Amino acid sequence: MVTLDTQSIIRTVNVNFYYGRFQALTDITMDFQKNRVTALIGPSGCGKSTLLRLLNRMNDLIDGCRVEGQVLFEDQNIYAPEMDPVEVRRRIGMVFQKPNPFPKTIFDNIAYGPRLHGFRKRSDLEALVESSLQQAVLWEEVKDILPRSAMTLSGGQQQRLCIARALAMKPDVLLMDEPTSALDPISTAKIEELIDELKENYTIIIVTHNMQQAARVSGMTGFFYLGKLIEYNATEKIFTNPEQKQTEDYITGRFG
């Protein structure tokens, strides 16, 4: 296992996670580097999406779940009693598997979160909406139709809108749970290009079943199996010279 604590922004320390009596994650210790893309791979049910969701306390919304160990964000345990989960989720944003725009206008999809956090001045909101859509490489496609319902956008545009919506909250980290699995190849390529651009300013952690995608977009890769972190290393090493036989068997298609 490789740890890179000199530049880590998130660190998990001996994390165990339970759904009721079922243990979904066992003794997970990882460092996530700042301004890098980290991919989490493994077969269905291996715990990678569970780990992603506990990195910003999304699992708090599930009855009966329990976390042991520490999840440190900038050296603060996000599960400490004094930590505000709403603020945690603002700074560690999430993009889901299927595009989930609000049934509102394109403009209001981006402005909704900032309004809840105190943005009131129209000119400030307009500037924030434009900059967020620019970062998500969507501005040129929607700048003339901002009053239109977000539901009229294509699937790929909706997913970029959801990324822009997350960016409008000024996060430090962006979590992506299979963000292209519901998209066509052209839309997938656009999202991958966007991920490459966003890593200049954000830390990105992506769950993907697509091994080729993990190889293309990430600098680090963690392989999970049955709730355990089997191997964590530079992506190139994981895919060309893995240290664990289970990793090699998975990436060569022997199981999964």
Curated annotation (Swiss-Prot):
GO CC, any one term: plasma membrane
UniProt keyword Cell inner membrane present: yes
Gene3D superfamilies on file: P-loop containing nucleotide triphosphate hydrolases
Its membrane topology: Peripheral membrane protein
Catalytic activity: phosphate(out) + ATP + H2O = ADP + 2 phosphate(in) + H(+)
One record GO biological process: phosphate ion transmembrane transport
Protein EC: 7.3.2.1
Transport among keywords: yes
Molecular-function annotations in GO: ATP binding; ATP hydrolysis activity; ATPase-coupled phosphate ion transmembrane transporter activity
Main location: membrane
Annotated ATP binding sites: G42, P43, S44, G45, C46, G47, K48, S49
Domain ABC transporter: 10-251
Cellular location(s): Cell inner membrane
CDD domains assigned: ABC_PstB_phosphate_transporter
Alphabetical list of NCBIfam families matching this protein: 3a0107s01c2
Purpose of the protein: Part of the ABC transporter complex PstSACB involved in phosphate import. Responsible for energy coupling to the transport system.
Family: Belongs to the ABC transporter superfamily. Phosphate importer (TC 3.A.1.7) family.
Subunit structure, interactors included: The complex is composed of two ATP-binding proteins (PstB), two transmembrane proteins (PstC and PstA) and a solute-binding protein (PstS).
Name of this protein: Phosphate import ATP-binding protein PstB
Organism: Syntrophus aciditrophicus (strain SB)
